[in-house]
Curated annotation (Swiss-Prot):
Pfam families: Hormone_1 (PF00103)
Residues involved in Zn(2+) binding: 44, 197
Residue numbers of Phosphoserine PTMs: 130
Protein family: Belongs to the somatotropin/prolactin family.
GO BP of this protein: animal organ development; growth hormone receptor signaling pathway; positive regulation of receptor signaling pathway via JAK-STAT; response to nutrient levels
Primary location group: secreted
Record-linked PANTHER family: SOMATOTROPIN, SOMATOTROPIN,PROLACTIN
Source domain of life: Eukaryota
Gene Ontology CC entries for this record: extracellular space
Function field: Plays an important role in growth control. Its major role in stimulating body growth is to stimulate the liver and other tissues to secrete IGF1. It stimulates both the differentiation and proliferation of myoblasts. It also stimulates amino acid uptake and protein synthesis in muscle and other tissues.
Signal peptide: 1-25
Full protein name: Somatotropin
Record's keyword annotation contains Phosphoprotein: yes
């Protein structure tokens, strides 16, 4: 055998033996960890937005008007027009892929308007986190997309296509109309994140929790 061919053969054998070691050194993240990470991200973001909503309400919306305003806020929510499950029981009737697609749809509908949060609310109002909400949304979006790739075997199948998004938050806080608009948007944001969190928890529970899913 020629010296050059002998060297190539030895290198091929070496790389073949090294392959399993490299794979063991950099294992793929288990599906359970992907779900756990996505659920934690959704819970954190949902709580952040819920706190922001409460603080905005306390600061700008008179208590006597809150009930009447809240009863009409559903009209603001574009997500009410899509066939997404409205609660845990309905979510349990859908497949994991369906729930992931709905979750992604809800998250992506807020990517554009959320970029205006830091222009609307002072840091003290949202506990210095308004600039990070967009980043947290993107992190959650990536987590959901990673789950979809795992469950769909890496294929990019067609799903729901988002054609509508929410309006931008209004920066004119001296206007009553703008205040009500922002109040409604925050309410929808909170509701949509609650839905996404619920879907992710339902999926995680029925895959990895043996007892009943109590949440």
């Amino acid at each position: 055998m020629a010296p050059g061919m002998r060297v190539c053969l030895l290198l091929l054998i070496a790389f073949t033996l090294l392959g399993p070691q490299r794979a063991a050194a950099f294992p793929a993240m288990p599906l359970s960890s992907l779900f756990a990470n996505a659920v934690l991200r959704a819970q954190h973001l949902h709580q952040l937005v819920a706190d922001t909503y409460k603080e905005f309400e306390r600061t700008y919306i008179p208590e006597a008007q809150r009930h009447s305003i809240q009863s009409t806020q559903t009209a603001f929510c574009f997500s009410e027009t899509i066939p997404a499950p409205t609660g845990k029981d309905e979510a349990q009737q859908r497949s994991d892929v369906e729930l992931l697609r709905f979750s992604l749809l809800l998250i992506q509908s807020w990517l554009s308007p959320v970029q205006f949060l830091s222009r609307v609310f002072t840091n003290s109002l949202v506990f210095g986190t308004s600039d990070r909400v967009y980043e947290k949304l993107r992190d959650l979006e990536e987590g959901i997309q990673a789950l979809m790739q795992e469950l769909e075997d890496g294929s990019s199948r067609g799903g729901l296509v988002l054609k509508t998004t929410y309006d931008k938050f209004d920066t004119n806080l001296r206007s009553d109309e703008a205040l009500l608009k922002n109040y409604g948007l925050l309410s929808c944001f909170k509701k949509d994140l609650h839905k996404a969190e619920t879907y992710l928890r339902v999926m995680e529970c029925r895959r990895f929790v043996e007892s009943s899913c109590a949440f």
